[in-house]
A protein has these predicted regions:
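Short, acidic, Ser/Thr-enriched surface-loop or helix-capping motifs
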Residues: 105-107
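FKBP-type peptidyl-prolyl cis-trans isomerase
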Residues: 101-103, 176
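Juxtamembrane cytosolic face of transmembrane helices
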Residues: 2-12, 83-96, 110-113, 120-182
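Alpha-helical transmembrane spans of integral membrane proteins, capturing the lipid-embedded, hydrophobic core
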Residues: 14, 18-22, 26, 72-80, ...
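Membrane-helix interface segments in multi-pass membrane proteins
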Residues: 26-76, 131-152
């Protein structure tokens, strides 16, 4: 059985991931907001040209701005989900890879794709539910996503215990270990 990685290294890997996610989100947000601002300005110009009396009233434009912000938020959420999907395909996030860690099954062998998908969905339940809430236009997913997300967040601190397993690892029978060749 391989040595399980404790809370400290896992937290360091997560910190690395967060830096990458912030950079990725910032780049995406910057391009998206620039594009949407150009679009919004074109709509305002068109509105002012078609009806000068409505030039000072941008109610429709404000609604468009809210829709644009929602789109940007969803784009960022999708980017984060995509970034962390490396855990499914590579058995580790970028932060874990940089620190020479991997996700394994409970006895230290390679984790199955099913276990990695389950772990991913549990770990990112809040973001997955936010996307579902947007797609079906109901707040129920958002509420339960927040609730389960909070439980999983608290469960991350289980990795500081003797078994070095977070709640999502316990539920999916996975552990985080040092790679053999690292």
């Amino acid at each position: 059985m391989e040595k399980r990685i404790g809370f400290g290294l896992r937290l360091a890997a997560f910190a690395i991931d967060i830096v990458f996610v912030w950079i990725l989100s910032g780049i995406i947000s910057r391009f998206a907001t620039t594009f949407m601002a150009v679009q919004a300005q074109a709509q305002v110009d068109e509105l002012m040209a078609s009806n000068p009396l409505l030039a000072g009233m941008y109610t429709g434009e404000m609604l468009n701005m809210v829709v644009s912000v929602t789109r940007i938020s969803l784009i960022v959420i999708f980017a984060r989900l995509l970034y962390f999907s490396t855990e499914i395909f590579l058995g580790a996030s970028v932060g874990k890879l940089l620190l020479g860690l991997k996700i394994a099954n409970a006895d230290g062998g390679n984790a199955s794709v099913g276990a990695l998908i389950g772990r991913y969905l549990l770990k990112h339940v809040k973001r997955v539910c936010t996307v579902l809430a947007f797609l079906v236009l109901t707040g129920v997913f958002n509420f339960f996503g927040s609730l389960f997300g909070f439980v999983i967040f608290i469960g991350c601190f289980f990795a500081a215990g003797d078994r070095h397993q977070a709640l999502h690892d316990m539920m999916c029978h996975t552990i985080v270990v040092k790679k053999e060749n690292a």
